[in-house]
Design a protein with these regions (language model features):
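Beta-strand-rich domain onsets/edges
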Residues: 16-18
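Bacterial N-terminal signal peptides
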Residues: 7-14
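Mitochondrial intermembrane space
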Residues: 20-133
Length: 133
């Protein structure tokens, strides 16, 4: 009887954890806003509906970096609980910037996605989706 109750508790916990998980992707380049930094370069931000913000800076970037950029890769850093997304210019030239979202609780890759460990590279942002709480 106790083992049946314990199994039931584990099943309910698994369902609740799954229900609380959200699926996210890096922000599309079109949703990222850039703001000039005082000493040159730009700050990049994309807001989420829950109030959190993807953010990053490139002190060497000209204004054209955002307009020319497409998604390149995503990586998860367990030590800082952060997901960083990198965007690059045409033909992967030096025009690049990154935005980071942290903290990310309960991060996990999506098995059908293109993640290799904590790194995902594909031109399609959706293929680098991840789950979190």
């Amino acid at each position: 009887m106790k083992s049946a109750m314990l199994a039931g508790v584990f099943a309910i916990t698994a369902v609740l954890n799954h229900a609380q998980a959200a699926t996210s992707t890096c922000p599309p380049a079109q949703s990222i806003k850039q703001t000039a930094l005082a000493n040159g370069g730009y700050r990049y931000e994309a807001s989420l509906p829950d109030g959190r913000t993807w953010a990053g800076e490139n002190p060497l970037a000209p204004a054209s970096y955002l307009a020319d950029a497409t998604f390149h890769d995503a990586r998860y850093d367990a030590s800082t609980k952060a997901v960083t997304c990198t965007y690059k210019g045409p033909m992967n030239n030096d025009a690049s910037f990154s935005v980071t979202l942290k903290p990310i609780s309960g991060w996990n890759l999506i098995p059908i996605a293109y993640w290799r460990g904590t790194y995902c590279e594909d031109a399609d942002i959706a293929k680098c989706a991840f789950t979190h709480r």
